[in-house]
């Protein structure tokens, strides 16, 4: 309390000591106003400068940080894309290394393509020809098979007829032997049972013990010393091989093989022994025909 009382007395004394000095009071008031304005202007200028500097620094820092972050992100993305391109190129090179190289189409000229096309058409035409030829061969084979079947049927008929003729000839031979009492037939009967050449007339008895008559007078490859062993065929006995060569005899007597088979052997007519040399070239005359 004492301290407060002392302060109050000092204030009262000060106010009473200078009441008549208005200039000084005005000076004091203006000084206080100046201090107040200085303080306020300082505070305002400080605040404005602080805000301006803060905004400038904020914008600068923002732009700097934005540019830095943009550049860093751009560089990072560029590097990553570069890495991806590098990896893509690497994978592409590795992948292409695994497969065979592909020749670009533009390396082939138009002339080469036309040549290949022409060659392909030729191959196709040749294949069509081969197909037609194969079809023709198949058709011919079918026709030959049918003809062979027909020939088989005809051969069976001929065999049956020949068997009938053979049986009739054997029967007539047996009757002749019974009537004449001789076993030597005047003529040769093909495939007749024989025990020697005498039982085959002009033919030969082929086979051991009971053989069969071979009425072919000239037997190819039959051993001989002269033409008489070859059925009397002129020039049939080959002196070098000592065997009968009937085909050479045809040539020596001016006959081709076709002529001998179609117009001479068993076709040329004869009357007997007197015709053997002229018409039958030494071969026997059997049943009125020259027998080869």
Curated annotation (Swiss-Prot):
Spans traversing the lipid bilayer: none
Residues carrying a glycan: 174, 254
KW Lipid biosynthesis (keyword) present: no
Keywords tagged on the record: Glycoprotein, Proteoglycan, Signal
InterPro entries on file: Cpg-3
Compositionally biased tracts (Low complexity): 38-80
Sequence segments annotated as region (Disordered): 28-103
Entry annotated with the keyword Glycoprotein: yes
Composition skew (Acidic residues), residue ranges: 81-96
Signal peptide from the UniProt entry: 1-17
Protein name: Chondroitin proteoglycan 3
């Amino acid at each position: 309390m004492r301290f407060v009382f002392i302060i109050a007395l000092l204030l009262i004394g000060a106010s009473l000591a200078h009441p008549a000095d208005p200039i000084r009071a005005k000076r004091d008031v203006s000084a206080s106003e100046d201090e107040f304005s200085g303080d306020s202007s300082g505070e305002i200028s400080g605040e404005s400068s602080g805000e301006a500097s803060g905004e400038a620094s904020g914008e600068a820092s923002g732009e700097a940080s934005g540019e830095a972050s943009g550049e860093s992100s751009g560089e990072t993305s560029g590097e990553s894309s570069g890495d991806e391109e590098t990896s893509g190129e690497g994978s592409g090179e590795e992948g292409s290394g695994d497969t065979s190289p592909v020749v670009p189409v533009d390396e082939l000229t138009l002339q080469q393509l036309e040549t290949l096309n022409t060659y392909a058409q030729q191959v196709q035409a040749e294949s069509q020809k081969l197909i037609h030829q194969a079809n023709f061969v198949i058709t011919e084979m079918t026709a030959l098979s049918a003809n062979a079947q027909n020939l088989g049927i005809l051969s069976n008929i001929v065999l049956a007829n020949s068997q009938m003729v053979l049986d009739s000839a054997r029967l007539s031979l047996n009757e002749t032997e019974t009537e004449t009492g001789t076993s030597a037939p005047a003529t040769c009967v093909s495939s007749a049972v024989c025990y020697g050449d005498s039982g085959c007339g002009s033919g030969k008895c082929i086979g051991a013990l009971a053989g069969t008559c071979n009425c072919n007078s000239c037997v190819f490859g039959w051993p001989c010393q002269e033409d008489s062993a070859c059925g009397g065929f002129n020039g049939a006995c080959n002196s070098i091989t000592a065997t009968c060569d009937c085909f050479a005899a045809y040539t020596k007597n001016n006959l081709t093989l076709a002529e001998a088979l179609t117009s001479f052997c068993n076709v040329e007519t004869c009357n007997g022994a007197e015709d053997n040399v002229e018409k039958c070239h030494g071969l026997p005359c059997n049943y009125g025909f020259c027998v080869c």
